[in-house]
């Protein structure tokens, strides 16, 4: 259950951070306006809180592992929202990142 909770929280964090950054991008780079930027800033702020609900108490570990989730989530966002087509190197890199996430967060640790 702890691993499942952690994975759900990583997914929520990715949605908030990547979605927030995308909204800011749309507001500024695509000239959609300040409301898009404001919504992005709110989403980015929400991202900051999501990590605090991770079951692991170590900030550095949680954020380091989240970095790998961010890489995979960013590519997925690009595919689903912006019609980006990752190449094999993007996919290989994303897979390596997920292995890193698993090792950092879920490897057994002696006490």
Curated annotation (Swiss-Prot):
An example of a Gene Ontology cellular component annotation for this protein is: plasma membrane
InterPro entries cross-referenced by the UniProt entry: UPF0060
Name the protein family: Belongs to the UPF0060 family.
Report the protein name in the record: UPF0060 membrane protein NFA_36830
Organism source for this protein? Answer: Nocardia farcinica (strain IFM 10152)
**What is this entry's stated membrane topology?**
Multi-pass membrane protein
Keyword Membrane listed? The answer is yes
PANTHER family in UniProt: UPF0060 MEMBRANE PROTEIN YNFA
Output the HAMAP family linked to this UniProt entry: UPF0060
Can you tell me where the transmembrane regions are?
A: 7-27, 33-53, 62-82, 91-111
Q: Does the keyword Membrane apply?
A: yes
Question: Subcellular localization, per the record?
Answer: Cell membrane
Keywords on this record? Answer: Cell membrane, Membrane, Transmembrane, Transmembrane helix
């Amino acid at each position: 259950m702890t691993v499942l909770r952690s994975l759900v929280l990583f997914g929520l964090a990715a949605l908030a951070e990547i979605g927030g950054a995308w909204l800011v991008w749309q507001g500024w780079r695509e000239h959609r306006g300040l409301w898009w930027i404001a919504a992005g800033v709110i989403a980015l702020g929400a991202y900051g809180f999501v990590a605090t609900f991770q079951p692991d108490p170590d900030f550095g570990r949680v954020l380091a592992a989240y970095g790998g989730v961010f890489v995979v989530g960013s590519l997925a966002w690009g595919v689903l929202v912006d019609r980006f087509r990752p190449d094999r190197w993007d996919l290989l890199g994303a897979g390596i990142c997920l292995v890193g996430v698993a090792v950092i967060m879920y490897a057994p640790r002696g006490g």
